[in-house]
Amino acid sequence: YEDELSKLNREEPPTVQLRTLPQREHTITESKPTLDEGFFIWHEKNVEPQKQEGYYLVHIPLILGDITADKLEKLADVVEIYGEGMMRATQGQNLVIRWIHENELTILYQTLKNLDLANPLASIIRNIVACTGASTCRLGICLSRGLARAIINEISDAELDLDKFNDINIHISGCPNSCSRHPIGHIGLFGAARHIGNRLVPHYVIQLGGKLAGSETRLAQGKEFIPARNVPAFMTDFLRAFQESPQHPDYEAFLEMQGRKLAEQLVTKYKHVPPFEKDKNYYFDWDAESLFSLAGRGTGECSAGVFDLINIDLASAHESVKEGKLLSATILSARSLLVTQGQEARDSAEALILFSRYFIDTGLVDESFRALIENTQHSVSKSEEDFIADIGEVSALVEVVQNLYDNMDQSLRF
């Protein structure tokens, strides 16, 4: 790393290649009066004056950046006529058209309205940003877009004045990787997986206070987990408390005075996951039709969320050895690295079978541990109270698995 850095420092920085944009001349149409009250609402929320007198930037808000191909093609025809002849995508997953003359605003509004693109969305709705998540990204842990839609539905149905949240943004990533830029979100979330019993449950880490503002830029802080199913309710309670606080509309003051402490209290309120038999919904991700799972993830694909899940199992295995809980330590060790082979066990018995198949049979773990695994299988299927094992052997298994993990590369290869 140091050698490569020194080499880069010795080289001349590359010349920035800027694309030359054509200068466009077009006739400004005469302004047509409008009696549509919606125009004034649209103007207030979606139109922003430029520094150049008489010209405006027009926002075209999209929910999570979604727009159909047919509608986009029709919008392209509109863009050819007005402003600079092009539209631009924003980091907030919306579109903007620049250089709209004040005389063009009314006719542009009517044209966008006909395309259902003049919606005066509250800024907190259009400022929700989500990465693609596990729906198409193999690095993703959770379905971040599904959660975003659930949050939009929840806060829209709640008794909140969404127009009074100013420019608060919510950034949601499907895993700890920052594709949605959750570290700079006023409210940031990233997906994770947690074992509840023998089942995986989608969770999110809540982070607060991110800010992108030149020298005042700072990263959001927070490490508390709550199940994905409870995030919309958490969000509604948190935003309601902010709206009713003496600090409103100053979000930073709210966080400093009471917001962070309140968030911790809400996490405690919403972190509980009921048993599968009582409420299966917690074991499904938002917009998912099948139980939450990391099965299918294999070598060459990984994210920080997978390492986090492995770390928890291994830490628990070490702790179980110290506490003399040898059965638990053996099962946790066997389960911890199954995700590296694209496997997920439905219960402890299956975890032990898969461990034998993918680790002992392949030579990754020494054959001498097979008897311990078979003994554990017998106890799990018959009577856990009868489990007898040598603490030294169980401790050795934990260390072998830990060593495998420590020497694993970023692509889950040993």
Task: Report the location of each language-model feature.
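Long, charged low-complexity segments
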Residues: 308-319, 334-414
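Extended, hydrophobic/aromatic-rich amphipathic alpha-helical segments that build helical scaffolds
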Residues: 329-332
